[in-house]
Amino acid sequence: MLYQGESLYLNWLEDGIAELVFSAPGSVNTLDTRTVASLGKALDVLAEQPNLKGLLLRSDKPAFIVGADITEFLSLFAAPAEKLHEWLVFANSIFNRLEDLPVPTLSAINSYALGGGCECVLATDFRLATPDARIGLPETKLGIMPGFGGTVRLPRLLGADSALEIIAAGKDVSAADALKVGLVQAVVANEKLIPAAIKMLKQAINGELDWLGYRRPKLEALKLNKIEAMMSFTTAKAMVLQTAGKHYPAPMLAVKTIEAAATMTRDEALQLETQHFVQLARSNEARALVGIFLNDQYVKGKAKKLVGETPVPQQAAVLGAGIMGGGIAYQSAFKGVPIRMKDINEKPLALGMNEAAKLLNKQMERGKLDGMKMATILANIHPTLDYAGFERTDIVVEAVVENPKIKASVLAETESHISESTILASNTSTIPIAVLAAALKRPQNFCGMHFFNPVHRMPLVEIIRGPKTSDSTIASVVAYASKMGKTPIVVNDCPGFFVNRVLFPYFAAFSLLLRDGADFREIDNAMEKKFGWPMGPAYLLDVVGIDTAHHAQAVMAEGFPQRMAKDYRDAIDVLFEHQRFGQKNGQGFYRYQTDSKGKQRKEQDDAVDALLKNISQPKKAFSAEEIIARMMIPMINEVARCLEEGIVASPAEADMALVYGLGFPPFHGGACRYLDTLGSERYVEMAQQLAHLGAIYQVPDGLQQKARSNEGYYPSVAPHADVSHGQPA
């Protein structure tokens, strides 16, 4: 043993070849600050070995290096800019020393080499990969860019176009694709990886391979003439602007970094990369996107812990073959849980099966599955008009019309056809579980399971614990949701649960703005273009359905009369009365036409202005900032109330529910992260200026207390101790 660190060790192999093995405690290797420092110490040891002829990098884990340790990011980014800059210079000096070793170097990549793991292997002369390997740089998805030389080495190895595509999109590529673009020299079976690596190193040592020739391009300027450079970078910037937009600065800055560094040597280019990395790392967007990653890990970890040893339901059923029922049936069957789809008429059953077939055909067209797999999935959906076989189901999801009497009747009837251990769940979006449970003999086996539309695309499932719901029921439903490929978040019972409860004050704010003379198109524009929602409130209401929103609004008003009841006719009332139900009948706030691809495109409809004139004050211009404040404060206030009442357990779960269920702009990180970025004190001041507009603008007590203490929802992060040259401060 030449060197033993916490997360890597150094050994002699044979004939002057040393191996550096990444071997972190735990199940995966990450390139954290300690590992980087340890790599530096290993290189110190290698520098003292006169007989060194070659170096092999490998992992003793199932994956090479899965990336940097993202749990360190927020504390690293909290460090003063100059300290973070110093640490990156120190870290890059280590990768440069690896790259500059006076002997050939090779990385044997098994499974994942992502982020810092990819940047590490780029510093070696050769790379071999197993067939299952994935190699890439996902940093821009976290609001940052590669910081260990990725923007420098990858373009010089692959050429600008391939590197720009990987870096700007935060992509990883398969071993086969890596071989095509020249990222690896060969793809080798797992059991032959190390022998092949040693053989290749020996060829380099013996002069059969020009290892310095492989290394040289990484140290020099990019091989591009002016016209090639202009075409590559202009195209890349246009693509980034189209896909990432202005709210996500990392991809564009990464492209501009590569462009500016194209004529530089390695060391000059690294200085620019470091400067731009620090700029991004200290941005609100990076904090938000890293926060989402960590919150996602927390939510999924909590679900896994909650399930424990609970078995996944093996047989399911869904009541109702409408849009939601059909979507649930498709998703269950697609993920391997056979499901009975019951309805009272043949027509909806046929529509449900056709919808499933249509979704599967799209997967076939994309090459995601073959005809045999498609047939198997469709065979796992059993359309039925009766309860035959329901006694063998483990879980039944009710997805009939959103009417408490109808739902209660269907649930009670179903309960008489299932076993005593079968779980019943309702896909209600607003009706309290306690209300529906009153009709059941076994309320302990009942809970809410709220899917979002379209089911196959939306990642969130809100699981609602009723007053009598048992822990084992929740565990089984969480297990089923996870098996379906969804992110389950457990909330407590109230009208609207969590997501719809916080959505309707937002819609109420929209109605108030219209009443006060705002143009709904300007509101949509501000909320989409400026704030970053995928749809503004008018467009969202059209997609949800004006009739659905009108009904849900009444449920919410009954549940929370102080805040959500209104004493005036609003735009939703008017459109509902004129049977403008949104996309479902082609007219709502906008008019809809189906394009050649079958997608509905919205168009302006001047008739709406005439309808809304009677319930609105004369037209008045509002700034984007005014619109955003008036729209977002009621939603954030309701999120705060839900946290204070224990409807949702944590800021992390609240934020992920909003991102995954409503499309809350990820670069804001969710309502709690957004509030923390604004500052609770500033937020309360903004809300107080609008308090005259009504109860939805009243800040709850707990949030007022946070403002007085200048606290946020997330704990403040102390700067990382290891940013001073990789050592504990």
From Swiss-Prot:
The active site is at residue 450. Keywords: Fatty acid metabolism, Isomerase, Lipid degradation, Lipid metabolism, Lyase, Multifunctional enzyme, NAD, Oxidoreductase. Gene3D superfamilies: 1.10.1040.50, 2-enoyl-CoA Hydratase, Chain A, domain 1, NAD(P)-binding Rossmann-like Domain. SUPFAM superfamilies: 6-phosphogluconate dehydrogenase C-terminal domain-like (SSF48179), ClpP/crotonase (SSF52096), NAD(P)-binding Rossmann-fold domains (SSF51735). Residues 311-729 are annotated as: 3-hydroxyacyl-CoA dehydrogenase. Pathway: Lipid metabolism; fatty acid beta-oxidation. GO terms for molecular function: 3-hydroxybutyryl-CoA epimerase activity; delta(3)-delta(2)-enoyl-CoA isomerase activity; enoyl-CoA hydratase activity; long-chain-3-hydroxyacyl-CoA dehydrogenase activity; NAD+ binding. Substrate binds at residues 296, 500, 660. One of its GO terms (cellular component) is fatty acid beta-oxidation multienzyme complex. It catalyses: a (3S)-3-hydroxyacyl-CoA + NAD(+) = a 3-oxoacyl-CoA + NADH + H(+); a (3S)-3-hydroxyacyl-CoA = a (2E)-enoyl-CoA + H2O; a 4-saturated-(3S)-3-hydroxyacyl-CoA = a (3E)-enoyl-CoA + H2O; (3S)-3-hydroxybutanoyl-CoA = (3R)-3-hydroxybutanoyl-CoA. Involved in the aerobic and anaerobic degradation of long-chain fatty acids via beta-oxidation cycle. Catalyzes the formation of 3-oxoacyl-CoA from enoyl-CoA via L-3-hydroxyacyl-CoA. It can also use D-3-hydroxyacyl-CoA and cis-3-enoyl-CoA as substrate. This is Fatty acid oxidation complex subunit alpha. It comes from Pectobacterium atrosepticum (strain SCRI 1043 / ATCC BAA-672). The gene is fadB.
